[in-house]
Swiss-Prot record:
Descriptive protein name: FERM domain-containing protein 6
Record membrane topology: Peripheral membrane protein
GO biological process, alphabetically ordered: apical constriction; protein localization; regulation of actin filament-based process
SMART domains, alphabetized: B41 (SM00295), FERM_C (SM01196)
Superkingdom to which the source organism belongs: Eukaryota
Subcellular location: Cytoplasm; Cell membrane
GO cellular component: apical junction complex; cytoplasm; cytoskeleton; plasma membrane
Principal cellular location given in the protein's record: cytoplasm
Swiss-Prot/TrEMBL keywords: Cell membrane, Cytoplasm, Membrane
CDD domains attached to this UniProt entry: FERM_B-lobe (cd14473), FERM_C_FRMD1_FRMD6 (cd13185)
Domain FERM span(s) in chain numbering: 16-320
Length: 327
């Protein structure tokens, strides 16, 4: 009997390797069929993580420094690099460079109790941990110290004097770089242990809940940013769309910061329209002449943003009765 080489084996030629980056800085590598649906890949990832409730999570690829979330009904190759799709696999250990995919939070919620699955809550917490490291809320500096105390309780458990002293944690793993630079490591390592001690007897799950509740109060943590253009001729987007739990924000891009121009809660958004590259926001109760018109750069980005905004709005409206009950 002749042995088929991997190069000639059609089944193996359709196999590719993907590397899934997780919120907790770990990754998983999966061999998949190049024609797999995004939904099927998400199911495989969740099975590996033993995550039962994935409705707040999605798979994304980075394009032009933005996370593009996959439409789960689409085939994966719609999002993959051309070289990755074309390359024939050369053997079980020779699949070539993997496609990089991110498993991350796609839809934010303000209350961790809405996440009943223990594993899902864990990864939601870790996603926020990473977002906090990039946060720039300079007027809320005390919040970062409280968040670090919750995170240390979640990660290390109860404070133990004989174990938790000196450099028992890395400040850079818990604080934005500007806080570490401003206060210094010695200051943080001196004051945080007492705050860690104050969380005594909190379980990891309870610490996650407290962390989530405090983290989403920071304006730049539970938010997705996407570049927008003022007109068709702009090359560098001078505006940024911020998608939050509660609505849409429009920012002017300055040299080192974003200046908030508009803040539209979902209850004040009358209509969103995407036509080709054009993006229109019609605030509720205002005449059509008062609509805001921006540009996305290409129809594909328009479609992606429309789906993301529509799904976020739908989730927000559906969760309001549940949130009122939790309060």
């Amino acid at each position: 009997m002749n042995k088929l080489t991997f190069h000639n084996n059609k089944v193996m030629q359709d196999r590719r390797r993907v590397c899934i980056f997780l919120p907790n800085d770990k990754s998983v590598s999966i061999i998949i069929n190049v024609k797999i649906l995004c939904h099927q890949l998400l199911v495989q990832v969740c099975d590996l993580l033993r995550l039962k409730d994935s409705h707040l999570f999605g798979l994304s690829v980075i394009q032009n420094n933005e996370h593009v979330y996959m439409e789960l009904s689409q085939k994966l190759y719609k999002y993959c690099p051309k070289e990755w799709k074309k390359e024939a696999s050369k053997g079980i250990d020779q699949f070539g460079p993997p496609m990089i995919i991110h498993f991350r939070v796609q839809y934010y919620v303000e209350n961790g109790k809405l996440i009943s699955d223990r594993i899902a809550r864990y990864y939601y917490y870790w996603h926020l941990r990473k977002q906090v490291l990039h946060s720039q809320c300079v007027l809320r500096e005390e919040a970062y110290f409280l968040l670090a105390a919750f995170a240390l309780q979640a990660d290390l458990g109860n404070f133990k004097r004989k174990v938790h002293h000196g450099d028992y944690f890395e400040p850079e793993a818990y604080f934005p770089a500007w806080v570490v630079s401003k206060r210094g490591k010695d200051y943080i390592l001196k004051h945080i242990p007492n705050m860690h001690r104050d969380q005594f007897a909190l379980t990891a799950s309870e610490a996650y809940l407290k962390y989530i509740k405090e983290a989403v109060r920071l304006d730049d943590v539970a938010i997705h940013y996407y570049r927008l253009y003022k007109d068709k001729r702009e090359v560098e987007g001078s505006l940024t769309l911020g998608l939050t739990m509660r609505g849409i924000q429009i920012f002017q891009n300055l040299e080192e910061e974003k200046q908030l121009l508009y803040d539209f809660p979902w209850t004040n958004v009358g209509k969103l329209v995407f036509v080709g590259k054009k993006f229109e926001i019609l605030p509720d109760g205002l005449p059509s002449a008062r609509k805001l018109v921006y540009y996305t750069g290409c129809p594909t980005r328009s479609r992606h943003l429309l789906q993301l905004l529509s799904n976020s709005h739908r989730l927000y409206m559906n969760l309001q009765p549940v949130l009122r009950h939790l309060r």
